């Protein structure tokens, strides 16, 4: 269960925020022992765990995600969970703890931890998430796939991994762009060439560049 900022005094909120920011684990433990909730929300509606990732406060993060009472799936105001942020920052050991020991949600609706891992080209994190059942073609609110984010990152090995795990080249985002179009938009020439070659082998035709209109089924 998460606890709002209002449940704590402003002094406690300020002290905890500062302690997490500076990775002062002793102070964090002291405040929690004094009754401050480890599910406290701080700047920007961020859970302490998410804030710890943002501030690169590794000691504090490792401590917090190990506490049984911490809600690891509570998002910030942008819908980001600690697993998403740890994936974005390439924190594989923490990602493993969150999934294996805390049961953090991998396949949430919208943007997922896999999207976030692919955004910064974190191959090891993406590989691990896929091994744990992450949906390779998960769609964000804008119909962006992890493959599109991997293409933007420029990590060719990651792009290959996703394709080998079944990523669909034909998916287009809400603007009508495919992963191939994304490669060309972000000047990833080598990736674009490889994806076009793969397209021709799979679909026996040359790729015609986007964007293409995305068909939306009308309601009956």
Question: How would you describe each model-predicted region?
Answer:
Residues 3-16, 165, 174-177, 181-220:
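Ankyrin-repeat-protein effector appendages
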Residues 8-47, 51:
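N-terminal segments that cap or nucleate solenoid repeat domains
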Residues 18-23, 51-57, 85-91, 116-122, ...:
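Ankyrin repeat A-helix N-terminal signature
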Residues 27, 59-60, 93-94, 124-125, ...:
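Conserved ankyrin/ankyrin-like repeat signature
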Residues 32-37, 62-71, 96-104, 127-135, ...:
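Ankyrin repeat domain, specifically the short helix-to-loop turn at the C-terminus of the second helix
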Residues 40-41, 72-75, 105-109, 136-139, ...:
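Ankyrin repeat boundary signal
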Residues 88, 109-111, 115-127, 131, ...:
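Alpha-helical adaptor scaffolds
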